Amino acid sequence: MKKIILILLTAVSVYGYAQQATDNLDLSLQQAIDLGLKNRYDVQANKYNLDIDENKIGRSEKEWLPEISGSGNMRYSPQLQATLIPAGFFGPDPALVALGAKSVSVFGLDLAQTIYKPGITVDVKIAKNNLELEQEKNKQAENTIKEKIALAYLNVLLKELQTKIASDDEQRYKEYADVAEGKLKLGTLIENDYLKAKLDYENAKVETQKAKQNYELAMDNLKYQINVSGGTKLTLTDNLESPAFSASSLAIKGDATNRTEIKQLVLQQQNNRLEITRFRQNALPSIGFYANYSRQFTYNNFDYSLSQWWSPFSYVGLRFTVPITGNFKNYDYIREYRVRSLQTDLNLLQKTADITYEIQKASVELSNATQNMQTTKNNYELSKVIYENQKQQYNLGSLLYSGVLDTEKSLNLSEQNYIKAVYDFLLASINYQKAIGNY
């Protein structure tokens, strides 16, 4: 009993340590994507489609294996069928004579081996092509999940920036309110101006609280996308200044042929050609080898211990199968897949043109968003300098609170422009990664 308790305590302590080890995660964007692909159940479920298609390849290849089967037939005839015996065999007159044994048993082994059947080889090629197609579909599903995780990760960075700016605004209005309170006590400020400053500070606190709430929601969404527990503390190691978001790292030349949509259409076209080949080969004859070895027991009962009544026999042969009317059906199937092939060619050309334009457009949007973010960031930094200057003027009494509010409009506009530019940049980076086939 003590041993069992000790084992349970050890297991609990190990589990607790494991939980503690996974409750804190430092994640870059790429690490978050890798973790999500590892943890998500839909990714794991999709991988079983690959196992199914791999099994189909093995099933097609096994068509070449010989078919070996055993059979048994035990028959008892209470009354044997009579056979007419002509005159001269058993007497001067014809007679009905029952020939044979009442008990007949035959046990044998049959072997059938395909020697020539062109369709099997093509079936294996089709199965392998379908596996490659399923791999590309699985990749497309993973790219969709990568995009969701990346959007969730970048949304946290955006909400973090909004929270920081809201906190800066709150601190700024707090300083205005503190100065106004001091002036009110000195009698150099009317009460209404003080109340305005206090109200603006309270409103700024509300905005900060809302920004923090949005940040927590964004973090919860990221945890959901990478499938970790809600109690896990995530620390994002990438930020807007990280090399991962630099213009040089994002400006990767895109190629439409790298997109899985193009690869799927190419594989679909290969499948069309293989189907045409398969139906053409259906018109060719099939050749098979067969053999049998059996032992027969004949007697009046089923006493198999009487070895003298056992007798073996065997045979071998070749079987030819030549389709005749099936060729009329094959013609319709061949025509259908020729039409599908033409259709796939056109879809491939259009999809290539679509993706080429998508890459070009996403590249321009990313370049513009990068420039706009840098410009608005400079304006945002300039607004901080303006704030320091006006704070000194307000402290010295050379600037009224109404003048402070006029300046705050410009400051708030700079902040909102910067946040919007960051949002556009993050969205453009996602769209570009998607366009070149990374997501």
Show which residues each predicted segment covers.
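Sec/SRP-type N-terminal targeting helices
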Residues: 44-48, 61, 115-142, 167, ...
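Bacterial Sec-dependent N-terminal signal peptides
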Residues: 1-29, 425, 439
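Periplasmic alpha-helical coiled-coil/stalk elements that build and connect Gram-negative outer-membrane
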Residues: 27, 55, 138, 144-256, ...
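Short segments within alpha-helical structural elements
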Residues: 206-228, 381-438
